[in-house]
Amino acid sequence: MTNPIIAFQNVSKVFEDSGTQVLKDINFELEEGKFYTLLGASGSGKSTILNIIAGLLDATSGDVLLDGKRINDIPINKRDVHTVFQSYALFPHMNVFDNVAFALKLKKVPKKEIEERVKEALKMVQLDGYQKRSIQKLSGGQRQRVAIARAIINQPRVVLLDEPLSALDLKLRTEMQYELRELQKRLGITFVFVTHDQEEALAMSDWIFVMNDGEIVQSGTPVDIYDEPINHFVATFIGESNILPGVMIEDYLVEFNGKRFESVDGGMRPNEPVEVVIRPEDLQITLPEEGKLQVRVETQLFRGVHYEIIAYDNLGNEWMIHSTRKAIEGEIIGLDFMPEDIHIMRLNETEEEFDARIEEYVEMEEPEDGLIHAIEEERHEENS
């Protein structure tokens, strides 16, 4: 990574009135011009990180850096960041122009320059011509665009977005996801986006930080996190998963459901207990005798693009299958999957331990025939 625009170094936060620790030794670096997402459930600490970057909250310990300089004691108005809040925080008595121009007027920017910059900012969010429109007469999506225009008009280095799409209906929220992502690419500004919506994070981000209980439990590209969840929490929080107990017999061979299957994972102890993850969309329905597993269909729901089928094997394990084929409740079906569809999770492994294990294992492999090496090389190229 080039010099990070934002960095957290061992940042913790404790609310003194309650004694609650909401951030625990947080470390990360943000590169300029990328779209980052802090993803987690309510109370995970994601908004606290955003507020510390903005200067709305102080870190209890640790350092917050902007362009390599410590900004813990720098006031809000001296930080080159701008926040878009969930409520948008627009002035209802002002029209669109005055809302967007507010900060420029405070800085006593010349009137002609204000008009030009407001017009350009509104054009960026497809609201040029709305300058005289009352805020009260705008739709939710239009108010969102005004808030974003106000955020970018000062050309900040970083834009912070605190669940800005959560109040919108599904269709409008999806449209705004596209618009926000395209806007960020055009501007080249670092966006830090907070959400509890996994699909939103996967769709928009260059890099995701998954948070739980004040800690970053995994970070990576959307593809990395979806395809290689680090633990049970991430696997269940990001998308739907079938998770079963298993045993890693040896490299590339795992046992679950009383059977042994080829996999693409290695670097673990022989006969080590693990958890096995197979995504619902990676399961193919076959004739019972042709499947690697046999299950009985319990129920199904039509989700528009696929049927969501719930089935049980003879050990009582529940299986979720996403299929374009409609099943018959009560029928026995076969399930087929490929070795690369099987994702192995060590029990209670941290992200640091995972990275160290993979690095050590790759060094042991021959480059020309090392499967793990090839996978890691591919992931490295995708992240470059």
UniProtKB/Swiss-Prot annotation:
Q: Where is the ABC transporter domain?
A: 6-238
Chief place of localization: membrane
Entry keywords, A to Z: ATP-binding, Cell membrane, Membrane, Nucleotide-binding, Translocase, Transport
Check the record and name the InterPro entries matching this protein: AAA+_ATPase (IPR003593), ABC_SmlMolc_Importer (IPR050093), ABC_transporter-like_ATP-bd (IPR003439), ABC_transporter-like_CS (IPR017871), Mo/tungstate-bd_C_term_dom (IPR008995), P-loop_NTPase (IPR027417), Transp-assoc_OB_typ2 (IPR013611)
Subcellular location per UniProt equals: Cell membrane
Q: Which GO terms describe its cellular component?
A: ATP-binding cassette (ABC) transporter complex
- Family annotation (PANTHER family): SPERMIDINE/PUTRESCINE IMPORT ATP-BINDING PROTEIN POTA, SPERMIDINE_PUTRESCINE IMPORT ATP-BINDING PROTEIN POTA
Family, as annotated? Belongs to the ABC transporter superfamily. Spermidine/putrescine importer (TC 3.A.1.11.1) family.
Protein's UniProt name: Spermidine/putrescine import ATP-binding protein PotA
Q: Which species is this UniProt entry from? A: Streptococcus thermophilus (strain ATCC BAA-250 / LMG 18311)
